[in-house]
Amino acid sequence: IGFGKNSQEVLIPSFISAYTGKNVQDVGLNPISDKPKINWSIQYDGLTEAFKGVFSRISFRHSYRSNFTINNFQSNLNYNENSFNASGNYESKMFFSNINLVEQFNPLIQIDLELKNSLRLSFDVIKDRAISLSLANNLVTESWGNEYSIGLGYRARNLKLWSRFASNANRFIGDLNTKLDFNIRKNLTVIRNLNIDDNKVSAGQSVFSLRISADYALNRNFSTIFFYDHLF
């Protein structure tokens, strides 16, 4: 008498404890009343002054985001705290279909540098995971993503472009910003069966992307952007 191994009162607290690092004794039986995790974002620019002879900006950034969602839940109209189901266990007060946890370090680390000559360098690392518990078939689906980005940019200040459409002596004067970004992302999905020792890799992907862009401000109200995106 109590709750069986496949009861949601057992699976949900175990799921939350396993994937959040909480002590199972601190996880309640009702996931709706569970406290959300704290999100944060940290940025540090303090090194700019120390290296001001070379860099006009040095910036470090770190951020964490999490979402905990419950899909399709309903009250058990036949619930009675003194009644038992056909297996001799307590009835569930509420029925849940899916429990989902999404976490992102976006970014885990971001380094943004701008030199005195207007050359810009950037480096990003992003890590994320999405975990779903299906109480209909006792399956856990885990998806991980790792992403790495390198960026190179340059700003040409007060660049003059001659055109008969310009009102300022037939020329435009503005900043030309050019940027090149290269990105690598790897995804992996694993399905775990909670009733048997069966873990299967169901999907995986490696994505490489290249983006080249240039934008030019013709005046305060009008600007042009040219870009090229390529996935391979």
Residue map of PLM features:
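Exposed, low-structure sequence patches enriched in small/polar residues
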Residues: I1-F232
